[in-house]
Structure formats: structure tokens, C-alpha cells
Amino acid sequence: MRMTTIGGAVTTLLLAMGALGALHGCATAPTDDAVAARAAASLKSSFAARGQAGLQRLDQDETQKLCSEYANRPLPASVAEKIQQANLATIRYPADGKLVGDWKNGEKIAQSGQGFQFSDDPKNPAGANCYACHQLSPQELSFGTIGPSLYRFGKLRGFTDETRKYAWGKVYNADAFSACSNMPRFGHSGILTEQQLRDVVALLVDPGSPVNQ
């Protein structure tokens, strides 16, 4: 008799759960677009403009939207190609054709993480903070590993015009060569000036740079 009571209770519970499941199945689930829109609105409402750090930084261009869309799933080859071609078209080379500056200044830029924060003076030049993600000069022992080592960048690739042009393009807009790269688009986004770009390229490709020793 006790076993019958328990069985009946379990049966009743299962039937109730089934009814709830049926009701849930009849409900209309929010679409991916609706969820994304709500998430974006929630994110935006949690920020406040402060100094030079304005809310316009939350606005995404087409590349950023695509990379966000595929953030947690494999990026299709066709989408990756679309992103790379679109960003390749944005790369601007100096009118005078000079791609290489002073590697000593490039080292300072690579070491500096200043710029674009609300507490930074917008009148001061921004840094690239390269060491946060890359190994460059062997004298610097503190470096990140999110990105590949750039030690001997020019020495391994050759001190050629092709290497210099590639280095400029990569620093200017990394998404042109690797879709959804973690690397900032230093030239495309206006983070570094043209001369700063030259100096960072020099750090990578100048035979006299410590990177190539």
C-alpha cells in the first residue's frame, strides 16, 4: 500500500511536469536579434561618458558587429574573407612612401599604455602598449603572450620592401590580415599618428633595432 502511494505521487508529479513542459513549448521564445538588442541596451546603460571616453565608443562598425556575432562560434571562411577584404581596403600608406621611422621612438611607443582613457590628457600622444601582448626587444623581460612573439621580426622575414609594407599594414589594420584579431587597428582607428606608425614599423624592421639582434 505504501509503495502504491509513492508511485501515485510520482506519477502525478510527472504528469504535472509534462503539462508545464507543454505550456512552455507553446510560449514564444525571444529571437536572437531581440536578445542581442536587449543585451546591447543593458550594456550601454551601464556606461557613463567621462572625459574623452564617450559613449560613442560603444558603437560598432560592420567588422566589429560581425566579430561580435561570431564571438562564441567558429568564424566561417567566407565571413573571414569578407572582413579581411573590407579592412584591407582601409589601409592608407604615407603619401611620401616613407614607411620606416625611428626605432628608438618605436620602443617608447611599444612600452607606453597611455592614451584614450578618461584619466589621460588627450593632448598627449597615445602609446601602443605592444608589450602587453608580444615579445619584442629581448631586454624587456615582462611581456604578454596573447599575440605571437615579434622578436627578430625583420631578421626572420628579410629586410625587404615587402616586409616593411606588410608591417605597416598589420599595424595599421590587423583585421586586414587576420579577421577578428585581438590587435587594435592602430591606424584605422586613429590611435597612432602616421609618424608613430612609422616608428613602430622601424622597431620591427630596422636592422639596428634590438628586436632584430
Task: For the regions a language model picked out, list residue spans one by one.
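Post-cleavage N-terminal segment of exported redox proteins
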Residues: 15, 20-116, 170, 203-213
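Local sequence-structure signature of Cys/Sec-based thiol-disulfide redox active-site neighborhoods
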Residues: 118-129
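Extracytoplasmic electron-transfer domains, predominantly the class I c-type cytochrome c fold
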Residues: 34-48, 101-105, 131-205
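Generic anion/oxyanion-binding catalytic loop in active/binding sites
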Residues: 94-95, 119, 186-189
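Bacterial N-terminal signal peptides that target proteins for export
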Residues: 1-13
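Secretory-pathway/luminal and periplasmic proteins that interact with or process carbohydrate-rich
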Residues: 116-119, 139-143, 210
